[in-house]
Amino acid sequence: MGTEGVRTDRLSILLEQFDKATDMARARLSGLGDEEYLWEPVPGCWSIRRRDEAVTPQAFGPGEWVLDQGDPDIPAGEYAEVARQAASGMSVEKIAEDWSVSVARVEEVLAHTGEPEPDDTPLTTIAWRLSHLHYEFAGGWEWAFGERRQDPKQMVDFTPSAAVALERFWETVDRWRTAVGGVTEEQLDTIGFSQYPYGSDPDDPFVGVIAGANLEFVHHMAEIALLRDLWRVRHAWSGR
């Protein structure tokens, strides 16, 4: 494979990774309809719902449709991340603030030994996963390049229309991509360049925030792709 003309600086590598991921995601989401977008493969899924039909205690959103969310907790799959935060010198109090849980809950996680119990977090719909990504990228832009004042969870008007959701989502993603493309080397290394209020962004160099955004995008798009595959064959396996 030739490498002539290929840039290998940190930002270019991250942007190339993101661009390839978004190209694949755009193709993978082609033809998404409303029924598939809102499809609940099993009972008890988290999704987007009308505000007066919300089934979770912390559902949020600025409009008629809200995104399901349960009470704050640290899922078993994130125990290793909490241990990493503690090992890096982050205080228990700060970890608790990042996860919106009590200090006692963080101490319980850090004291855990052996394999964590399986997570009981409900399965989520394509609508939930796409909406989750949408508000994170909207908030990511706001708290790094915008006015740093809007609550990310109130920035996206969730919709039951797949076409409308995708149009708005890609506009948000494109705005993030354009802004990140102009970041300087100094800004990449600036701790707190992003003040995103949920998570550890204010304590991280911005290069780590960008890498984390890439990972979050790939992670959720892979889940959406699998749900699309299951939707396509749903009649075959539902009768077994």
Where are the regions a protein language model picked out?
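Acidic/histidine-rich alpha-helical segments that form the ligand environment
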Residues: D157-F193, P205-V218
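Short alpha-helical "recognition helix" segments of helix-turn-helix
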Residues: K94-D98
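Short, charge-rich amphipathic alpha-helical segments embedded
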Residues: A104-H112
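Short, contiguous alpha-helical
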Residues: M1-E81, A111-M155, S194-R240
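Short, amphipathic alpha-helical "recognition" segments used to contact nucleic acids or chromatin
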Residues: I74-M90, R105
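Generic beta-strand or strand-like secondary-structure segments
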Residues: R105, W128, H132, R168-E171, ...
